[in-house]
A protein has these predicted regions:
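Core catalytic alpha/beta fold that binds nucleotide/phospho-ligands
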Residues: 1-147
Length: 147
């Protein structure tokens, strides 16, 4: 089943929440009992137009003053997308109005009760998971290539 924004859910198992994302051979899947969102992106070049369209001034300044602007942009991008997925609206929310505040090993945002953790994978991917702030996040790697 999917909601009006395309977020999937299990039919007859609504208490089990999940979210998926994939990029260049990497698949991220989050499963739990609370709403969550996950996004993974390959760290690569980005379009300045996209930055100005989806980022607020603080984020734009962070991106362009960073020693690694690609990594900084995709950290913000995956956090924004994981947040939208956790809210169940995808990218249909005011992307520039949110503020991500570093808090310990994660980030808080304007939506009370949610936290976001960002991970770098193999120096090539940015992965963000948005969950209820009390939900524990456990990462497990599964290699489907048998290696």
């Amino acid at each position: 089943m999917r909601n009006q924004y395309g977020k999937p859910s299990f039919k007859n198992k609504e208490h089990i929440k999940f979210n998926i994302s994939h990029c260049n051979g990497l698949i991220a899947c989050a499963v739990g009992l609370e709403e969550m969102g996950v996004d993974v992106e390959n760290i690569r070049s980005f379009d300045d137009y996209v930055v100005r369209r989806v980022c607020n001034m603080k984020e734009i300044n962070d991106i362009y003053s960073s020693h690694d602007s690609k990594r900084t942009f995709f950290t913000y991008w995956t956090m924004k997308e994981s947040l939208g997925k956790a809210l169940g609206v995808g990218l249909h929310y005011p992307l520039r109005e949110n503020e991500f505040i570093k808090n310990g090993d994660g980030y808080l945002c304007n939506y009370e009760g949610l936290k976001i953790k960002n991970y770098e994978i193999d120096n090539k991917f940015s992965l963000s998971i948005c969950t209820d702030k009390n939900q524990e996040i456990i990462l497990k790697e599964v290699n489907l290539n048998g290696r």
